[in-house]
Amino acid sequence: MNLMAQFTYDLNPVDFIIADAVGEPGKRTFYLQARAGKQSVSLVLEKQEVNNLAASVLQLLAELEEKYEDLPPIAHAKKVVYPEQPVEPSFRIGQLLIGYDEDTDRIWLIAKALMVNEEGSVIDPDDERVPSARIVTTRQQMYTMSEHALEVVSRGRPICPLCGRAIDRLGHFCPRTDGQAVPIIL
């Protein structure tokens, strides 16, 4: 089976992977970027998707440590990885799958683009026209990516303790106060 025919981008194994953001808080664009040799890919995600990916990876790593006690430990020292600039998105992620290959001790991600047809309906991610990427990493690379991703997500605007919405620099009118409170301004 020709895997390159299955994936628009097939990065196996990657030299680096990072989840990061560009722009000012409140207007940031979040992305997942990976490189293998001369091939690189930058994939756009939402902030919450980056957070969910990082949390899922850390949960998977914990489960793997429990299940496979003989796996080499992950170093918890932070390795600095910098994204390639400029960030040129290949596509916006519509579907993201994560898995583990115990034979190679590698974690893989399969990302499929979010595409819509002329009528505005979402195209099935399994449609052969939908761009996709396979990213194969070490457990260490995914740990480092996840720790950095959580740090990047936390750099955003503070969250209102009452309604859970982001507080803008210009102020925040919380719907939970029903207009009866002074706006929160940072």
Model-derived regions: residue spans:
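Positively charged, low-complexity terminal tracts
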Residues: 1-186
